[in-house]
C-alpha cells in the first residue's frame, strides 16, 4: 500500500525554503594569499585592502586610492582628454573596442588612469592613480594623455605630482601608439623637473613592463608598498630564459630597497603621512600652509 504524501513536509516546506532562500554573494569573503585566512570583505575594504593580521597588501582601485589619500572634502577629479578608441582596428580573440567596453563597465572609468587635485595633509597636490582592473592598468594613448594632463595640472597649480603606479606594461592592442607614450610621459616628467616641482612615485603591486621602463622609475623619490612586484620582465619569464632559479623575493619591493632601486618601503596606512611630510620638505612649505622656515622660526 502506498503511503499518502505528507504535503506539509514534502511540498509546502521546500517551497517556503526556496521562496526565502538568500543567495550568498561570491565576494563576501576575501582569502589571504599568504595565510589562506578568510576575512570578511567589508573588513578588508575598511582596512584599505590590507589583510588584518598578515598585513598582506591587496590590489587597490584608483578611486579608493584617491579617496584614501586626499583630505576629506578637499579634492576634485581632473577631466581627462578623449582619444581615438581603436586607431588600429585591433582584434584578437575579441575586438579591442569590446574589451574597452567591458573594462569600462567593470571599473566605471574611461581608461586605466584617474587624476585628482586637492589637499593631502593640508598641502595642495596633484595625484595620479593607475587602475589595474582596467586591462591590467596597461599604458595606451588614453593613459599616456592622462599622465600628461596630470603633470600639466601640477605645473599649472604649482603642486607636487604623486603617481601610484600599477600596470602590466604597454597595451599591445595599440602597438607603436602605445610605445610612443613612454617618451611622451618622460618629457612630461622633465617639465616637472625644470619647474622644480616634486615628482613622487609609489610603486604598487604589480608595476611592470613599459611603465617601469618609463615614468614609474623617474621620480625624485620612489616609495613602494610591501611585497610589490616591480620589474620589467617578470621572474617566471627570466627563469625560463636563463634556466636558473632566482633568489627568494627577487624583484619584490624589499629586495629593490636593499639594492638601492627604491628609497623606502611604506605600509599603505602610512603613505598619506609619509607623502605629506616628503612634499613639505621638498617644497619648503609646512603642512599648515606657511613656509617651513617661518614655521620653525615661530
From Swiss-Prot:
Any Pfam family matching the protein: Carboxyl_trans
Domain CoA carboxyltransferase N-terminal intervals: 28-297
GO molecular function list: acetyl-CoA carboxylase activity; ATP binding; carboxyl- or carbamoyltransferase activity
Signal peptide span: none
Main location: cytoplasm
Keyword Signal listed: no
Gene3D superfamilies the UniProt entry points to: 2-enoyl-CoA Hydratase, Chain A, domain 1
Catalytic reactions of this protein: N(6)-carboxybiotinyl-L-lysyl-[protein] + acetyl-CoA = N(6)-biotinyl-L-lysyl-[protein] + malonyl-CoA
Descriptive protein name: Acetyl-coenzyme A carboxylase carboxyl transferase subunit beta
Species of the source: Methylobacterium radiotolerans (strain ATCC 27329 / DSM 1819 / JCM 2831 / NBRC 15690 / NCIMB 10815 / 0-1)
Gene name linked to the record: accD
Amino acid at each position: 500500500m502506498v503511503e499518502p504524501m505528507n504535503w506539509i513536509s514534502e511540498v509546502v516546506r521546500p517551497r517556503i525554503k526556496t521562496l526565502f532562500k538568500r543567495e550568498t554573494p561570491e565576494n563576501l569573503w576575501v582569502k589571504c594569499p599568504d595565510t589562506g585566512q578568510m576575512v570578511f570583505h567589508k573588513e578588508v575594504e575598511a582596512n584599505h585592502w590590507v589583510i588584518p593580521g598578515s598585513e598582506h597588501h591587496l590590489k587597490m582601485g584608483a578611486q579608493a586610492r584617491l579617496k584614501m589619500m586626499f583630505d576629506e572634502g578637499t579634492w576634485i577629479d581632473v577631466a581627462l582628454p578623449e582619444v581615438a578608441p581603436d586607431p588600429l582596428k585591433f582584434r584578437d580573440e575579441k575586438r579591442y573596442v569590446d574589451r574597452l567596453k567591458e573594462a569600462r563597465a567593470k571599473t566605471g572609468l574611461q581608461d586605466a588612469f584617474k587624476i585628482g587635485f586637492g589637499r593631502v595633509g593640508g598641502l595642495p597636490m596633484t595625484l595620479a592613480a593607475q587602475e589595474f582592473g582596467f586591462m591590467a592598468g596597461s599604458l595606451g594613448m588614453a593613459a599616456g594623455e592622462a599622465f600628461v594632463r596630470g603633470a600639466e595640472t601640477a605645473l599649472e597649480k604649482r603642486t607636487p605630482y604623486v603617481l601610484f603606479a600599477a600596470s602590466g606594461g604597454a597595451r599591445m592592442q595599440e602597438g607603436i601608439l602605445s610605445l610612443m607614450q613612454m617618451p611622451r610621459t618622460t618629457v612630461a616628467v622633465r617639465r616637472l623637473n625644470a619647474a622644480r616641482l616634486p615628482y613622487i612615485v609609489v610603486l604598487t603591486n604589480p608595476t611592470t613592463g613599459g611603465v617601469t621602463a618609463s615614468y614609474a622609475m623617474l621620480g625624485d623619490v620612489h616609495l613602494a608598498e610591501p611585497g610589490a612586484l616591480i620589474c620589467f620582465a617578470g621572474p617566471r619569464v627570466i627563469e625560463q630564459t636563463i634556466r636558473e632559479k632566482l633568489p627568494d623575493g627577487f624583484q619584490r619591493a624589499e629586495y629593490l630597497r636593499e639594492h638601492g632601486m627604491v628609497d623606502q618601503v611604506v605600509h599603505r596606512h602610512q603613505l598619506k603621512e609619509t607623502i605629506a611630510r616628503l612634499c613639505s620638505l621638498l617644497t619648503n612649505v609646512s603642512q599648515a600652509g606657511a613656509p617651513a622656515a617661518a614655521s620653525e622660526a615661530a
